[in-house]
């Protein structure tokens, strides 16, 4: 069978698995919908969070950004990852402690202020819409390549699938679906990384290939041949103030 047929089979099987998990995880009360009955194990929650991070934005955009910008792309990676860490340490634990389901409810009750609640609502909407726009664009690109449709149709298909998980299973369905996606994404990352490392350096472990071979020098030379700065050159076209604000943003 051709690579296209194998791709179709594997993607179809994985999607059928996601749909089955979403159906089995359907909920009937608000606690199950918003906080997955507070019964998801820590390891599963970690896997789901990892799958969220390894989303379309990371899998497509972040990988391309670092590949194109080299060391300069690390400022986006550090800011993005740092935001996840701050959220996990400074906000997420206290939502459960306060018994709240949403960030605006928590902020409003914590600071006894409806103004703070409104500010939290505006911030949540702004951040969510910005993130979702990039995510859905990535979903549209993936479906357009896979189903041979235009990107707009791919976005619509992705919206329908996401709505199915969110409406039927709430956070419980989304969490367990993300756990399954985590496994798929890890494998999808490892296969090309191992293959490229083996072909270029003969070392099948990407971390060792990057450390103990001349792959960095080759990347630097490719960048120079294309008229760009070296792959490992740090912040060649940015001031430290630019770097600081991009990382914070």
Q: At which residue positions do the language-model features occur?
A:
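Membrane-interface "cap" regions at the ends of multi-pass membrane proteins
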Residues: 1-59, 166-169, 192
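Transmembrane helix-loop junctions in multipass membrane proteins, especially transporters and channels
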Residues: 23-30, 92, 96-101, 143, ...
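Membrane-embedded alpha-helical core segments of multi-pass
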Residues: 13, 17, 58, 83-90, ...
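Loop-to-helix junctions at membrane interfaces in multi-pass transport proteins
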Residues: 2, 37-40, 44, 61-75, ...
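Alpha-helical transmembrane segments of polytopic integral membrane proteins
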Residues: 26-27, 56-59, 63, 88, ...
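Helix-loop-helix module between adjacent transmembrane segments
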Residues: 19, 50, 74-169, 221, ...
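Hydrophobic alpha-helical transmembrane segments of polytopic
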Residues: 3, 7-14, 44, 76, ...
């Amino acid at each position: 069978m051709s690579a296209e047929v194998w791709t179709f089979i594997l993607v179809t099987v994985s999607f059928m698995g996601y749909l089955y998990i979403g159906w089995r995880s359907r909920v009937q009360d608000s606690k199950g919908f918003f906080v997955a009955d507070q019964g998801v194990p820590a390891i599963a929650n970690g896997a789901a969070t990892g799958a969220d991070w390894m989303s379309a934005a990371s899998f497509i955009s972040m990988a391309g950004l670092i590949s194109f910008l080299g060391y300069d792309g690390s400022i986006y990676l550090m800011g993005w990852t740092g935001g996840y860490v701050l959220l996990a340490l400074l906000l997420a634990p206290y939502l459960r402690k306060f018994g709240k389901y949403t960030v605006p409810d928590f902020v409003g009750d914590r600071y006894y202020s409806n103004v703070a609640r409104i500010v939290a609502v505006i911030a949540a909407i702004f951040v969510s819409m910005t993130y979702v726009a990039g995510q859905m664009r990535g979903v549209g690109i993936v479906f357009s390549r896979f189903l041979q449709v235009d990107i707009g149709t791919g976005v619509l298909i992705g919206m329908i699938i996401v709505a199915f998980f969110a409406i039927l299973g709430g956070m419980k369905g989304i969490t367990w679906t993300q756990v399954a996606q985590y496994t798929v994404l890890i494998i999808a990352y490892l296969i090309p990384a191992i293959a490229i490392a083996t072909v270029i350096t003969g070392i099948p472990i990407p971390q060792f290939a990057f450390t103990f071979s001349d792959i960095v020098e080759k990347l630097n030379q490719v960048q120079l041949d294309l008229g760009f700065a070296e792959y490992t050159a740090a912040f060649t076209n940015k001031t430290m103030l630019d770097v600081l604000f991009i990382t914070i943003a």
